[in-house]
């Protein structure tokens, strides 16, 4: 029988909506980095109460029919104009082997246009806030994913250009096994296209919905969680300056044929402040996806690496329950997944939140409790109470090790 040990946690109130906008994406207007009041990060236990208030953090305009809302008014970026190409192509470096075996090539708009047969829906593999993603096989036989920016975004050209260049600049400086690889970009008239690694097995959300026809077992889910944690840790600790992804969610996690995770979509990424400057956060209007947004960021406009930690906590709950962060089709008590999960957890009924597609056994039940415990620490309302992504990676590594050992002994 599973343990019915009672727990008590406080979690931050998620961004919710009162209408059908569960995938709504916020956009931002940037402000200069400003120092915050000094506060000492101490290791604290999660407060001994459950937050009873879940704030409706935004109300989408009635006139918006898309799931993505663009209110960006960023200042113009001279870099964008200087990087436009009259031929509609950009010179990039592509590596197909090891670091010493690189090929230099040039993407052109015509090549991509022909390969997708005028961006035919038959080549479409995804849709997001940035635009549409297509699978492309070019003349050299290599397969890529190309992200074509929405034309509607160009009504606010400065904001669209800034977001496009943000993703390019971020992708160009990161290299990690669990991050989608960047190959280049194309600008041709009003067309803006990113060329990135093609990851063959769809999104994590597709697999949790069983759209791919196979249920992810607990071992695979722990691998995915660990991969994502390592990728975010790399962004926070091993890039200079650190990078805040700002849109960690299941539809931005791609799976390889071996079910290893790759974090994608850096359109909302921001550079964290240089610690030498004395700044502790970036002041910026909100950008992200409803249900995953850090409530402290929502109320203070102060973005830090701990905002990614909060989103990661939501992702962990999603991995374990199989549910989306916001499920408007459910009753009021179950509509917000993290609120429902923590109530079950604190009442000692943890096993009831396990994805019904997973078997209830001793190994799965233990992993469920341990990962949920860490997830709720990530969901603490105040960033100082959340663990770092490095700490999350270490904890997940240990949970996965214990899970494998318990699974092997029970066979």
From Swiss-Prot:
Q: Where is this region: CaM-binding?
A: 134-159
Cellular location(s): Cytoplasm
Q: Which residues carry this modification: Phosphothreonine?
A: 108, 284, 289
Has UniProt tagged this entry with the keyword Membrane?
no
Q: Where is the Protein kinase domain?
A: 119-398
Q: Which EC number(s) does the record attach to this protein?
A: 2.7.11.1
User: Which residue ranges have biased composition labelled Low complexity?
Assistant: 16-44, 66-95
Q: Which domain of life is it from?
A: Eukaryota
What is catalyzed by this enzyme?
Answer: L-seryl-[protein] + ATP = O-phospho-L-seryl-[protein] + ADP + H(+); L-threonyl-[protein] + ATP = O-phospho-L-threonyl-[protein] + ADP + H(+)
- Stretch list, region Disordered: 1-44, 66-99
Tell me the GO molecular function terms. Answer: ATP binding; protein serine kinase activity; protein serine/threonine kinase activity
Residues the record marks as active site: 247
Q: Which residues carry this modification: Phosphoserine?
A: 251, 283
Q: Which Pfam families match?
A: Pkinase (PF00069)
Q: Which residues bind ATP?
A: 125-133, 147
UniProt KW keywords: ATP-binding, Cytoplasm, Kinase, Nucleotide-binding, Phosphoprotein, Serine/threonine-protein kinase, Transferase
PROSITE patterns from the xrefs? PROTEIN_KINASE_ATP (PS00107), PROTEIN_KINASE_DOM (PS50011), PROTEIN_KINASE_ST (PS00108)
Q: What class of enzyme is it?
A: transferase
Q: Which GO terms describe its cellular component?
A: cytosol
For the modification Phosphotyrosine, the affected residues are 297
The cysteines joined by S-S bonds are none
Which GO biological-process labels does this protein carry?
pollen development
> Subunit structure, per the record?
Interacts with calmodulin (CaM) in a Ca(2+)-dependent manner.
Question: By its UniProt entry, which PANTHER family does this protein fall under?
Answer: OS01G0750732 PROTEIN (PTHR47989), PROTEIN KINASE DOMAIN-CONTAINING PROTEIN (PTHR47989:SF71)
**Descriptive protein name:** Calmodulin-binding receptor-like cytoplasmic kinase 2
Query: Native species of this protein?
Result: Arabidopsis thaliana
